[in-house]
Amino acid sequence: MAQITAKMVKELRERTGAGVMDAKKALVEVDGDMDKAVEFLREKGMAKAAKKADRVAAEGLTGVYVADNVAAVTEINSETDFVSQNDKFVKLVKDVTKTIAEGKPANIEEADELKMDDGSTLDQAFVNATATIGEKIVLRRFALEEKTDDQEFGAYQHNGGQIGVITVLEGADAATAKHLAMHIAAMNPKVISPDELDDEFITEQLALMNHKIDQDNESRELVHKKPLPHLVYGSEKQLTDDVLAKAKEDIKAELKEEGKPEKIWDRIIPGKMQRFIDDNTQVDKQFAVLSQDYIMDDSKTVGEFLKEKGAKLVAFQRFEVGEGIEKKQEDFAAEVREQMK
């Protein structure tokens, strides 16, 4: 039987990322053959990964990487936020995101086959990570954006990598592109322009907003405050010429009823019309980035800010860890009982 030295264990650990005891056991099992030990650990890792396949991985990190005219954002999940702070996990996220930016795969299946710097595929890297870290580790999703030489990328990660954003801007400098990425991280828009919002989506969101108004009005009634009116419209898409013309006539009728002199109406009407538009584009303000108040200067919208800069937002991607994943609710008492059987 071959003698297993500390040097052999160290080499195997460097090649596979395995723990000391796992590396030593593998070398013993294959009588010191290094290549067979690597294969042994690989198969063991696949078995461990298979056992963890049905677990919910909803924690983790986003990764952001820019390589010349290509940028990638990824979401890589673990089962606990504790593991997401592990140095090995953090390095894996960086390496995988870099590999995807450079390889430009079309989907997860293609990404799994990409080779990393150490020669392993992404798929094998996740199997190894699951085995060595001890939790299910998966690439949930990724997005790629490409730009031309005269465009600019903005890249930003928030809250230690819980949110990752990339932007593509035309006619802007790097600082503007990054500031807009920061805005998107904070405000979570879904589209660039209100034109991209689906009519059914606008109707659904308007109903939710009016439901919230109803709840607020119940509280206002308790303190004898005037109830807030329901929103009639939610997007500039719904503010047709006829709608705006009627709103203007209603404002004139209101001014007349209040006894305001006609000669000052022209000074009052524009402000009231803007208020009408602001009140009836709340869905736009929540979901369309160009309609949102700019977080660096809320006296203007993002659209107004970009116009001042002579810039245009071409595309953006925003990933937040765990979006849309139903997290498993742990029953710790049941878990303890199960372990005591």
UniProtKB/Swiss-Prot annotation:
Family assignment from sequence similarity: Belongs to the EF-Ts family.
Residue segments, region Involved in Mg(2+) ion dislocation from EF-Tu: 80-83
Keyword Cytoplasm tagged: yes
Compartments where located: Cytoplasm
Keywords, alphabetical: Cytoplasm, Elongation factor, Protein biosynthesis
Any one Gene Ontology molecular-function term assigned to this protein's record: translation elongation factor activity
Domain of life of the source: Bacteria
One Pfam match: EF_TS
NCBIfam families on file: tsf
Gene Ontology CC annotations of this record: cytoplasm
UniProt protein name: Elongation factor Ts
Record-linked InterPro entries: EF-Ts_dimer_sf (IPR036402), Transl_elong_EFTs/EF1B (IPR001816), Transl_elong_EFTs/EF1B_dimer (IPR014039), Transl_elong_Ts_CS (IPR018101), UBA-like_sf (IPR009060)
Gene that produces this protein: tsf
Function: Associates with the EF-Tu.GDP complex and induces the exchange of GDP to GTP. It remains bound to the aminoacyl-tRNA.EF-Tu.GTP complex up to the GTP hydrolysis stage on the ribosome.
